[in-house]
């Protein structure tokens, strides 16, 4: 259970403690320095969503194979390729940090009882004024976690006990992105914006890192690192 409090809140809503609850676990497995596996999960709850959307389950898995530790990888190969490893991961990541801080409780409407859109005056000198009620936000019980699906495939290569090369290809697909609806006709009579989990985005790319290390003697060695990253995103 995690609780955050704001000391400079500007309203009753933002002054309330923010609370999240979560349960997580991790399982790892390794055999003979050759085979590796890992599984993680998170079961998280957020106060920002209605009861039917409050909790989300976000698992991930990963695996690796150290090919250079297999018996068929003889010494002649190791003198050239001293390390060869394949690895991959896939998982889901949830995000409840969406919208503005004033929009904490999406399942509750918010109104301003002293609205400035119109007011009424009466009395002999018209000194009595009553403001109207302004709608700030409409409730939406369907607002839920933003979810990112992430995948990574990697290759690690060691050459001549000098060079270490890492190559990673990654993809990410995000859905349920929170945003304002732009296609609501004025004839429907809404006086405040409408929000929903309406967006999607995807990205992919790769990253290459090369390290070179060489010891000239016991007192002098040299290390050099270079990397390159490419990423492309579409919405």
Q: Residues of each region from the PLM?
A:
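Extracellular/periplasmic, surface-exposed regions of secreted and cell-surface proteins
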Residues: 1-235
